Amino acid sequence: MATQADLMELDMAMEPDRKAAVSHWQQQSYLDSGIHSGATTTAPSLSGKGNPEEEDVDTTQVLYEWEQGFSQSFTQEQVADIDGQYAMTRAQRVRAAMFPETLDEGMQIPSTQFDAAHPTNVQRLAEPSQMLKHAVVNLINYQDDAELATRAIPELTKLLNDEDQVVVNKAAVMVHQLSKKEASRHAIMRSPQMVSAIVRTMQNTNDVETARCTAGTLHNLSHHREGLLAIFKSGGIPALVKMLGSPVDSVLFYAITTLHNLLLHQEGAKMAVRLAGGLQKMVALLNKTNVKFLAITTDCLQILAYGNQESKLIILASGGPQALVNIMRTYTYEKLLWTTSRVLKVLSVCSSNKPAIVEAGGMQALGLHLTDPSQRLVQNCLWTLRNLSDAATKQEGMEGLLGTLVQLLGSDDINVVTCAAGILSNLTCNNYKNKMMVCQVGGIEALVRTVLRAGDREDITEPAICALRHLTSRHQEAEMAQNAVRLHYGLPVVVKLLHPPSHWPLIKATVGLIRNLALCPANHAPLREQGAIPRLVQLLVRAHQDTQRRTSMGGTQQQFVEGVRMEEIVEGCTGALHILARDVHNRIVIRGLNTIPLFVQLLYSPIENIQRVAAGVLCELAQDKEAAEAIEAEGATAPLTELLHSRNEGVATYAAAVLFRMSEDKPQDYKKRLSVELTSSLFRTEPMAWNETADLGLDIGAQGEPLGYRQDDPSYRSFHSGGYGQDALGMDPMMEHEMGGHHPGADYPVDGLPDLGHAQDLMDGLPPGDSNQLAWFDTDL
């Protein structure tokens, strides 16, 4: 190791060389600066003399770090030589940085840049000058292009109109080249004569190259609003539509992209394309296989069809639904699938296109993409499926779609859950296979969980409750479904939905579900314990009062509140109480609410379904002696006897059963006369002994068929964009048909309700009569 004395001796020996190096740097320049004025700055130097603050710098450390940065060492002579080279080439380095084009070709200039990631000061200072130089050059070129085009346009316009097709072709090529540069492109679009000549040439030529160049020129012009207007004013749209029939792919591409730009940004373009027959041409192009071309074409169709019924019908007549469904079934390119799903969404609100899409397999094709990573594609498919689903209740092969929809109920996206619930509601209506499939894949549990999570979001709870209502009746798994709602803790939340803030559409659906749940004896006690019976009576009283009030005012039309007829609520609540009354404890609660006078009054209703459910609940209540006596005391014998002659077998049978039970304590003679009357009324076509009927009417509907929801026209609200108020079968059956034969409608009492004891208290918390209807309206959005 060197001693202190050795180091001092070495330092003294190097002192003259160090001073000489510093003097040279001050006279010339530091090897890494390239700037003469560097000597007058206070930038630190290797000697440390240039900055008084660094007099105490450890030079050994500096030398150590310097050595670490290089793989070889330099002698003082070599350093001096390199320093001299840098000083001699300083001007060349500055010129190379700022004006590289002025250097002689092949000239080598030593660089002062040690690290490629860190530019030198000269290089950094040169950047603005380079940018300025390029800007000036571009400006000169732009001006040259503009001047050249301005001078050439009149002559090129004449050449495009020449009779010699060779001349026309050459002119078209030149115009196409000019349109690629911005300055000349602006000059072209500012010449109406030139644009008209381009359009005319494109439309009339038989030469492929000429067509390609002219179409390409219009495509270039269409990237500017001024160009779009020029094309539009020159009659370019009919010509471009004609080009959609070209056998040349490049011409097709130019034509469709130019039309797409026009449709997006040029006012009046949509009508012009429709009038030129563009829709038919575009639908015919859907059999192409270029996915990017198809994406632009389908987007054009969406723009044209949106909000225009005539366009939707033209697409239908041209075979559009089948072609669009084929695309959804065939391709995987996300943008194409998205644009195609947008067209289908627009068409799915058209009553004519809807069945065509369904018949083409649209439900299954759209269902293929519900698990796609693209959320915009999934959402469009769901919206379209929701719109189509009310027309797809008879479709086969829906197993995969149903399973996916049940899974989507667990999504955190509210829009996804809303659509999935609405689709399931429609697809489970009147389709026992779909009902069984949904039950088998855990649909009951998923729907109950959805209702629990939704809270008071009725756009989710209403379709979910309707789906549960469908799943709990009229199929082999119905009893399992009725039990499953209870086992998955659904009864409390279902009963809760009968209360505020629920609106009438949701209340109607919930009443129907409770009626179905009551078909399962195991649900009788839990429903009673949750307070379902008093709330049903409360709703019944309110709805009946509304119908009475309207009748007393001379109204003949059925009253709608939030899209629901109050007669539907009367029928639904009475029907639910009818099934609940099969349980002896429930009968006691129902009778204790002083409902018998109201049920007797309902026997006078002009609506057959209300007559039937009223007679049905009285039939159940009449099993108890006290109730039978109360029914008779309310004067039920007269209306029941009248109803024996009803042409509705359900009404007549229930009426007979009530009369029969009311006669159990009567003298034998009365029983005999009644038996004759019942036999003659009930068995007019097939006379038989009364005692052969056993328990007539005691279990009508026991197979799980809600008496108010017939197989051919269930109480069903379609969840598609047409709104809650539209039914899949075109009618709402709960109160649709009046009794065909004689009925006591003229004597229907309109005086006040019998005293229910707690009627006023029951009125609190009912939905308002004038709330806005909750519905999805028919829209392309």
UniProtKB/Swiss-Prot annotation:
According to the record, the residues making up region (Disordered) are 34-56, 705-781
Which cellular component appears as one GO term in the record? Answer: spindle pole
Glycosylated residues are S23
PROSITE patterns given for it? ARM_REPEAT
Annotated Gene Ontology MF terms? alpha-catenin binding; cadherin binding; nuclear receptor binding; protein phosphatase binding; RNA polymerase II-specific DNA-binding transcription factor binding; transcription coactivator activity
N6-acetyllysine: residues carrying this PTM = K49
Phosphoserine occurs at which residues?
Answer: S23, S29, S33, S37, S45, S191, S246, S552, S675
Coiled coil ranges (UniProt) are: none
* Phosphothreonine sites (modified residues): T41, T556
Location(s) in or outside the cell = Cytoplasm; Nucleus; Cytoplasm, Cytoskeleton; Cell junction, Adherens junction
Fetch the Pfam families from UniProt: Arm
Keyword vocabulary terms for this entry: Acetylation, Activator, Cell adhesion, Cell junction, Cell membrane, Cell projection, Cytoplasm, Cytoskeleton, Glycoprotein, Membrane, Neurogenesis, Nucleus, Phosphoprotein, Repeat, S-nitrosylation, Synapse, Transcription, Transcription regulation, Ubl conjugation, Wnt signaling pathway
- Region (Interaction with SCRIB), start-end ranges: 772-781
> Superkingdom of the source?
Eukaryota
InterPro entries (UniProt xref)? ARM-like, ARM-type_fold, Armadillo, Beta-catenin
Where S-nitrosocysteine occurs, the residues are C619
User: What does its PTM field state?
Assistant: Phosphorylation by GSK3B requires prior phosphorylation of Ser-45 by another kinase. Phosphorylation proceeds then from Thr-41 to Ser-33. Phosphorylated by NEK2. EGF stimulates tyrosine phosphorylation. Phosphorylated on Ser-33 and Ser-37 by HIPK2. This phosphorylation triggers proteasomal degradation. Phosphorylation at Ser-552 by AMPK promotes stabilization of the protein, enhancing TCF/LEF-mediated transcription. Phosphorylation on Ser-191 and Ser-246 by CDK5. Phosphorylation by CDK2 regulates insulin internalization.
Where is the sequence biased in composition, kind Basic and acidic residues? 734-745
Q: Where is this region: Interaction with VCL?
A: 2-23
CDD domains noted in UniProt:
CTNNAbd_CTNNB1
Description of how the protein assembles with itself and partners: Two separate complex-associated pools are found in the cytoplasm. The majority is present as part of an E-cadherin/ catenin adhesion complex composed of at least E-cadherin/CDH1 and beta-catenin/CTNNB1, and possibly alpha-catenin/CTNNA1; the complex is located to adherens junctions. The stable association of CTNNA1 is controversial as CTNNA1 was shown not to bind to F-actin when assembled in the complex. Alternatively, the CTNNA1-containing complex may be linked to F-actin by other proteins such as LIMA1. Binds NHERF1.
Q: What does the sequence similarity comment in the record state about its family?
A: Belongs to the beta-catenin family.
Role:
Key downstream component of the canonical Wnt signaling pathway. In the absence of Wnt, forms a complex with AXIN1, AXIN2, APC, CSNK1A1 and GSK3B that promotes phosphorylation on N-terminal Ser and Thr residues and ubiquitination of CTNNB1 via BTRC and its subsequent degradation by the proteasome. In the presence of Wnt ligand, CTNNB1 is not ubiquitinated and accumulates in the nucleus, where it acts as a coactivator for transcription factors of the TCF/LEF family, leading to activate Wnt responsive genes. Also acts as a coactivator for other transcription factors, such as NR5A2.
Spell out the protein name for this chain.
Catenin beta-1
Look up and give the organism this protein is from: Canis lupus familiaris
